[in-house]
């Protein structure tokens, strides 16, 4: 691919198994790419957690859909947090709307809390509750059909948020305008990089996926449906 300056990546499902460490094989691919391109992580979670999952691979990281941003400092071999926004959340209103949706969809039984609130201002609607057993979460909606069936209704209930079909049993919400496209576009504008010079690599590009905003944009998108094929997908970018 010609004229590419920046390659941006999703993490879970793209570079790694969900919540699992970066494999040595995929780390080697990143190291090879770093010799030719500027690399960037664009994540839904905290920058520090992403950095740990990557085995402290030297890379700039956007976290929380753009609410957080950290640069890799080669001298300290650590992240330097440049932005860490914490936006307000009307918890009473969110709580009421989630409770109403639970009643509408028959999801009134849950373990723990009704809603999970994050310091950034992001919100998680955990269908099975904040203290659900992991096995129950994994088996609830593995193909996302249950959540996609009601996705538009959840979106309509939260017009001030970007809503995503998150994890195995939840909906994740980021305050507008924050999503991965907005975060990547902002990063490019700050560095003077055009969209034509960017490639994004992700797995969650279907309806409600948190990579969908980039997938539907003018940025070149490479789909990865299995993190074990990451090296194969990156081969054209490493070809002479």
What does each model-found stretch correspond to?
Residues 1-9, 25-28, 32, 240:
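Non-catalytic pre-domain segments flanking phosphatase-related domains
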Residues 3-20, 184, 211:
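Asp-based phosphoryl-transfer active-site loop
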Residues 7-9, 61, 200-201:
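Residue-level marker for buried hydrophobic side chains located in beta-strands
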Residues 20-112:
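Active-site phosphate-binding/coordination module
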Residues 43-44, 201-205:
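Glycine-rich beta-to-alpha transition loops that act as phosphate-gripper elements at the mouths
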Residues 104, 109-199, 207-210, 217:
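Conserved acidic, metal-coordinating active-site core of Asp-based
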Residues 191-195, 208-240:
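Asp-based, Mg2+/Mn2+-dependent phosphohydrolase catalytic module
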